[in-house]
């Protein structure tokens, strides 16, 4: 949620911000219309309360003098009825105004590219050595900014679906039979590889000061509304029937809500938390996309970075969580690029977002594996998370980033580390797996 006082004094700034994000500026008009109505009713309400206080004092003085005050008491009763009516009206206006306020997006950072479409995200850097099928060379050079390190290969790598089924480590048919599309069984060494990825990421983040948690996998509506953009996530979230609960789409939402309605001490900040959880997504808006395999699925495991910090430090911490994620993928040997996400693709909460996109040689394209965002005080306002500082209380800033979404990284490893019909395990994971290759079962 944005700062109401800031909005009231910077209407044009927020209108321009909506324009940059592709959001209808009419929501700003709606807010100011409701806000003026709220102010008008509030003035009347305060006037009635003041009149009641004046009348109450006058009645008390009259009673001291032995005067009859029945008429005055009748007037006070009428004022009370008016106050009750105005209080009800102002609550209704507040609810409608707040509903509009929730839809107004966060102010974007000055470094965000002003444009629309993922294809217009700004390439920040490319890292790694890629294998590029000859027909995909132009796509790779364009996606890496023209200077990516790569080698041309004459045969396209097998898809993770074909390779996984040949090696006996992925079973999609059985999962579809019992659960439907976008579910999977992963088996034996591929499962051990997934567990190795999780343990490696947990160790990596623990060594960098993160407290590792497994959060609740369900959140109530109040927490979910405060932590995320329900309008954006309406096609993503699973609602528990007859319960005020939703399955989480990411542990970010549980971790952010963990400190809702709390005051922190300045000395406690920053608070670094790594969430380890299953994630559940309906993917209702992804009809026809990645219908086969384990790249885009309804259930997957993810390690998430989250930081609560002081406002003046948040931009440094955005670079920190991005650097953490990059170090993980450099150590795995997965080629990737970092992009500065453009204004039209940020979502409502983020003031700035970086994506890390790995090169997938079987698909011949870069694809997102990490999103790292600074939500500034927007999420903290929605969840009412403040800290005490000299001179008054202030909202914290919140930041989040994927460390590893396991199914996507399994796909990246299967495509980038194919060797003679088997899968080579990245060196840093061998101590966790206990084996160097995945061969046919």
UniProtKB/Swiss-Prot annotation:
Its taxonomic placement starts with: Archaea, Methanobacteriati, Thermoplasmatota, Thermoplasmata, Thermoplasmatales
- Provide the catalytic activity annotation: tRNA(Ser) + L-serine + ATP = L-seryl-tRNA(Ser) + AMP + diphosphate + H(+); tRNA(Sec) + L-serine + ATP = L-seryl-tRNA(Sec) + AMP + diphosphate + H(+)
Which E.C. number(s) belong to this protein? 6.1.1.11
Q: What is its main location?
A: cytoplasm
Q: Where in the cell is it found?
A: Cytoplasm
Name of the protein this chain belongs to: Serine--tRNA ligase
Top-level taxon in the UniProt lineage: Archaea
Q: Name one Pfam family in it.
A: tRNA-synt_2b
A GO term from the CC aspect: cytoplasm
Tell me the subunit arrangement.
Answer: Homodimer. The tRNA molecule binds across the dimer.
Q: Where does ATP bind?
A: 281-283, 297, 368-371
State the pathway, as annotated in the record: Aminoacyl-tRNA biosynthesis; selenocysteinyl-tRNA(Sec) biosynthesis; L-seryl-tRNA(Sec) from L-serine and tRNA(Sec): step 1/1
Q: Which residues bind L-serine?
A: 250-252, 304, 402
One GO biological-process annotation of the entry reads: selenocysteine biosynthetic process
Cite a single GO MF annotation: ATP binding
Keyword annotations: Aminoacyl-tRNA synthetase, ATP-binding, Cytoplasm, Ligase, Nucleotide-binding, Protein biosynthesis
């Amino acid at each position: 949620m944005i700062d109401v006082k800031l909005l009231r004094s910077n209407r044009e700034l927020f209108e321009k911000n909506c324009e940059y994000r592709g959001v209808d500026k009419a929501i700003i008009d709606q807010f100011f219309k409701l806000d003026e109505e709220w102010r008008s009713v509030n003035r009347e309400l305060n006037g009635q309360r003041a009149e009641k206080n004046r009348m109450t004092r006058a009645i008390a003085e009259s009673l001291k003098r032995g005067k009859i005050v029945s008429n005055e008491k009748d007037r006070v009763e009428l004022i009370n009825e008016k106050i009750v009516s105005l209080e009800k009206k102002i609550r209704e206006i507040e609810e409608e105004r707040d509903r509009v306020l929730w839809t107004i997006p966060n102010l974007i950072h000055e470094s965000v590219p002003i444009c629309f479409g993922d294809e217009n995200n700004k390439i920040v850097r490319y890292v790694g050595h890629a294998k590029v099928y000859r027909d995909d060379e132009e796509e790779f050079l364009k996606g890496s900014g023209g200077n990516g390190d790569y080698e041309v290969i004459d045969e396209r790598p097998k898809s993770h679906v074909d390779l996984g089924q040949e090696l006996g480590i992925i079973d999609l048919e059985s999962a579809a039979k019992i659960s439907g599309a976008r579910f999977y069984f992963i088996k034996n060494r591929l499962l051990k590889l997934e567990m190795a990825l999780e343990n490696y990421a947990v160790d990596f983040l623990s060594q960098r000061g993160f407290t590792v948690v497994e959060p609740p996998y369900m959140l109530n509506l109040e927490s979910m509304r405060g932590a995320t953009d329900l309008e954006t996530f309406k096609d993503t979230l699973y609602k528990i029937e007859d319960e005020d609960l939703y399955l989480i789409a990411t542990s970010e939402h549980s971790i952010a809500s963990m400190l809702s309605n709390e005051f922190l001490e300045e000395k406690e900040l920053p608070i670094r938390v790594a969430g380890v959880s299953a994630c559940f997504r309906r993917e209702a808006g992804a009809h026809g996309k990645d219908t086969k395999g384990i790249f885009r699925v309804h259930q997957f495991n993810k390690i998430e970075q989250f930081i609560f910090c002081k406002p003046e430090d948040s931009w440094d911490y955005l670079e920190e969580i991005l650097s953490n994620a990059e170090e993980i993928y450099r150590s795995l040997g997965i080629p990737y690029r970092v992009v500065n996400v453009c204004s039209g693709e940020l979502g409502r909460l983020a003031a700035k977002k970086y994506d890390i996109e790995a090169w997938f040689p079987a698909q011949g394209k870069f694809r997102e594996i990490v999103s790292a965002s600074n939500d500034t005080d927007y999420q903290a306002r929605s969840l009412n998370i403040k800290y005490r500082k000299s001179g008054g209380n202030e909202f914290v800033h919140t930041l989040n980033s994927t460390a590893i979404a396991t199914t996507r990284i399994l796909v990246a490893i299967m495509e980038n580390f194919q060797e003679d019909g088997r899968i080579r395990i990245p060196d840093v994971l061998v101590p966790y797996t206990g084996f160097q290759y995945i061969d046919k079962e």
